């Protein structure tokens, strides 16, 4: 990673983005592409074909040693002991005060080696938290500056990538598994994961290999996509964004992440979260579909029929796939029944909306 004079870092693909005419913006300490040809076009390329994203700003930590699993189990809410080598798990790190330090991916390299992939904005905070909780003889190393990461997403991804990858039958690679391989002549870690809801892979490689792999993907027909499309894609899929839908004040139970909160063993905040799961919470994260024209945005009030505020939008957009406003937000449990009608306060107008589960696309 390179740093600029104004302290913004640049990924190994920075020059590639400029050549493609990307609109660059500051994002979590990096200069990152928000769009190339346009958000809507990029969004549809991922839903219908194959798009690529530079997500090298993400953080990667390596936890190793005979007691590595003990540390991973303690700091994360999911059950990492269920992972075999080559498997990935979505999880979160409770903060001991009812909230979330970060959500993350846990890669099981072996029972004595794990790679944690964390949000760029939380890299320093996460590393400090993990090391503060390391009461075992586990080695924790921040490898974030050593890796580039390209997300290759969409239904055509396996077919596009296969001629240039030495892993056979990519289309049969199970979701949330990974394997080392060679892509466009370079060593890489190929992970069947993503943040778009359209399938695909995430490729981890050393910085010097990133421009060549990126160029190879473009020549093979992939569309370059920016952070703008990444956000609309993840919101349509109902995926939480740290800092919007989850943070230090929201619990995984409130956020609908009970499915990654397992109680087989002890972990940070275990008893508190178990009580929440059994007794329920005062608010819950729900999805909202606008019934009339209007784009819901973060911070907008959610109101009942009496005009009382019963919640707040945490993420919202005009869905490129559906052509209507969609959002996620926290709402009082008493008003959170699926199918219930509420209103979103957009400027001076109360625009009707329906309460739905997060995840707005038809199931395929």
Region spans (language model):
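Acidic, proline/glycine-enriched N-terminal capping motif
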Residues: 1-91, 99-101, 228
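N-terminal glycine-rich flavin-associated loop
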Residues: 55-66, 107-115, 153
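Internal amphipathic helical hairpin motif
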Residues: 66-100, 157-186
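Well-ordered mid-protein domain cores that form the structural environment of catalytic cofactors
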Residues: 79-133
